[in-house]
């Protein structure tokens, strides 16, 4: 089965409002108790059971690192997917685009440019700039089009009556959208771990890349098997360990050019010596900025922006 195929994945259980919609990994009977997963886990979510290692689902941050280090493939993600609202069901009178705090920091002009594209199709869509960690203050039944995987997860689960769909599913559905021609460009794709359980997002992104004549060389850990770039380790382990994990992830990607759709991943790939290509930049035929912020600088700026929005 392809890592971006959803034909054999099971829809996840209904979301419980107020509880962040997180998934986890588990250890199968193939475990040989080597302990590699426990050493790599940034949050100490894995412990030795009676016959094999076990994952505490409440502690697990769903980064996927255990799956990348397990020599037997015994550490696996839960086999569930989370559906998006059908684009055909979008109510334009209650439709919003949230660019996410990180995009707004990275290139403040991008949200308005993307809004222009969306307004050509959805005339009544509104820009929504409230951080996903705060009450969105929009009507029950509204839908937020999200760029950020974390925003998608939090908006759909922490707040009553909010539907979500990724920007990439929506943009891919715009049949008359003119896209730049990037013929000759070969890339790997680093899929955001927050979208791991949405293969429809992975499919939309590959479709957009194909429309731009970009060749994709997939890595073993992509799509529903993608693992965190390492940035989510920040705050759990020393920065040196975060940077080690970032380098580990970069090595897994066959191409030096890496398509990403998360700003934290842009910074991570720059640090690891890859050339990140931020998907909004590709679609708009713009150059991706090679972010030089340290881990602390990036997270300080992001934290301040979150507090203010």
Residue positions per predicted region:
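Short glycine-/small-residue-rich flexible loop motifs, especially phosphate/cofactor-binding loops
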Residues: 28, 38, 57, 67, ...
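Iron-sulfur cluster-binding electron-transfer modules in prokaryotic oxidoreductases
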Residues: 3-12, 22-25, 77-309
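Ferredoxin-like iron-sulfur electron-transfer modules
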Residues: 11-33, 44-62, 75, 82-85, ...
């Amino acid at each position: 089965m392809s890592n971006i195929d959803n034909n054999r994945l099971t829809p996840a259980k209904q979301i419980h409002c107020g509880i962040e919609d997180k998934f986890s990994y588990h250890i199968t009977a193939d475990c040989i108790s080597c302990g590699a997963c426990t050493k790599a886990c940034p949050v100490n979510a894995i412990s030795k059971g009676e016959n094999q290692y076990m994952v505490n689902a409440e502690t697990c941050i769903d980064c996927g690192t255990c799956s990348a280090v397990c020599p037997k493939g015994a550490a696996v993600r839960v086999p569930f997917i989370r559906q998006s609202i059908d684009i055909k069901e979008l109510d334009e009178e209650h439709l919003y685009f949230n660019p996410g705090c990180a995009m707004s920091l990275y290139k403040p002009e991008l949200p308005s440019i993307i809004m222009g594209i969306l307004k050509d199709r959805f005339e009544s869509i509104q820009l929504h700039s409230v951080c996903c960690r705060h009450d969105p203050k929009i009507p029950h039944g509204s839908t937020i089009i999200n760029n950020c995987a974390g925003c998608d997860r939090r908006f759909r689960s922490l707040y009553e009556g909010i539907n979500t769909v990724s920007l990439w599913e929506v943009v891919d559905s715009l049949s008359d959208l003119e896209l730049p021609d990037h013929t000759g460009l070969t890339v790997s794709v680093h899929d955001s771990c927050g979208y791991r359980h949405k293969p429809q997002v992975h499919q939309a992104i590959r479709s957009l890349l194909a429309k731009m004549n970009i060749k994709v060389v997939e890595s073993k850990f992509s799509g529903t098997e993608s693992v965190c770039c390492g940035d989510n380790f920040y705050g759990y382990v020393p920065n040196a360990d975060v940077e080690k994990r970032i380098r580990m992830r970069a090595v897994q990607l066959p191409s030096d050019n890496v398509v990403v759709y998360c700003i934290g991943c842009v910074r991570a790939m720059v640090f690891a010596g890859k050339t990140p290509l931020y998907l909004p930049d590709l679609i708009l035929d713009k150059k991706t900025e090679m972010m030089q912020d340290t881990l602390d600088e990036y997270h300080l700026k992001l934290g301040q922006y979150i507090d203010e929005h």
